[in-house]
């Protein structure tokens, strides 16, 4: 970051989305903004494992409204310090990572994806929860450190989220007159391979599909919380001009965001 001053000439807005905030204030986004020399505004936002896609949605909205031309979206996910290592069903799959995405109305890039549509939904659930907060100091019921860490009811999450996300993506495609068979890639939240494969099979109507349709970088990097779907996108975006893809996150909240993309690059991409 310290070696990147001058980027303020390119980026005027910056959004930081993460499922785990490093602190309440000053905003980490504003600290990064200062180091990069970005003018305008920056802010943090938290929407669980949909923090990255919700931040991209906000960036798109800012550009569409005329508030900005280019927005830098940064999504650090450092989950491992927040995990209870005494509970294997919770800790074993998490990893740490960070992604950055440039959202712009600049049509001159030789590697560009057009956002065709976004669809978002939230539905309250305690099945994925953390009570870590400054309010703990004033709470009437004392809790141990273990009580404040990441918690999930995995079986309930699987049973409730999989059909919810599959129906959500299916509806999103119908809203845009896109057949599931016309989707070249599904870049989904990297919760686990079982959830990803089940959701995709429900959307396309069969569990007999090429594994490249729904990339699984989780096998190497683990569950990277809200950064996972963009890790999948970055590592497996071998589309041709005119191909469509779906980025979809889902997680604590519950929160779900589906982003429909069209690859529009006019020339071969750089290696």
Language-model features and meaning:
Residues 4, 8-48, 53, 173, ...:
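Conserved beta-ketoacyl condensing-enzyme motif
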Residues 87-159, 163, 167, 250, ...:
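Condensing-enzyme catalytic core mediating Claisen C-C bond formation in acyl metabolism
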Residues 17, 46, 71-77, 103, ...:
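Short beta-strand segments
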Residues 20-21, 39, 47-64, 166, ...:
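Claisen-condensing/thiolase-fold acyl-transfer catalytic domains that form or cleave C-C bonds
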Residues 67-98:
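Flexible, glycine-rich active-site loops centered on histidine and acidic residues
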Residues 1-7, 11, 263-271:
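Single conserved hydrophobic/aromatic residue that forms the stacking wall/gate
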Residues 4-12, 85, 135-184, 195-199, ...:
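Conserved active-site "lid/cap" helical segment
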Residues 25-27, 57, 82-87, 256-260:
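Short acidic, glycine/serine/threonine-rich loops at helix termini
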């Amino acid at each position: 970051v310290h070696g990147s001053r001058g980027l303020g000439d390119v980026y005027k807005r910056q959004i930081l989305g993460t499922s785990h905030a490093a602190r309440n204030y000053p905003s980490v986004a504003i600290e990064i903004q200062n180091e990069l020399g970005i003018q305008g505004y920056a802010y943090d936002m938290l929407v669980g494992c949909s923090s990255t896609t919700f931040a991209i949605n906000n960036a798109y909205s800012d550009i569409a409204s005329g508030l900005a031309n280019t927005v830098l979206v940064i999504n650090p996910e450092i989950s491992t310090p927040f995990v209870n290592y005494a509970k294997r069903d919770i800790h074993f799959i998490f990893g740490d990572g960070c992604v950055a995405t440039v959202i712009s109305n600049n049509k001159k890039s030789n590697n560009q994806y057009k956002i065709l549509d976004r669809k978002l939904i939230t539905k309250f659930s305690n099945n994925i929860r953390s009570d870590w907060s400054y309010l703990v100091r004033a709470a009437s019921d004392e809790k141990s450190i273990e009580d404040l860490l990441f918690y999930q009811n995995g079986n309930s999450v699987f049973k409730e989220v999989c059909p919810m996300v599959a129906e959500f993506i299916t509806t999103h495609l119908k809203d845009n007159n896109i057949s599931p068979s016309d989707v070249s890639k599904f870049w989904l939240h990297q919760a686990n391979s079982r959830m990803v494969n089940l959701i995709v099979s429900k959307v396309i109507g069969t569990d007999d599909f090429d594994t490249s349709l729904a990339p699984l970088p989780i096998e190497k990097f683990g569950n990277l919380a809200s950064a996972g779907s963009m890790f999948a996108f970055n590592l497996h975006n071998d589309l041709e001009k005119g191909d469509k893809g779906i980025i979809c996150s889902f997680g604590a909240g519950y929160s779900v965001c589906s982003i429909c993309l069209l690859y529009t690059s006019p020339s071969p991409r750089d290696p």
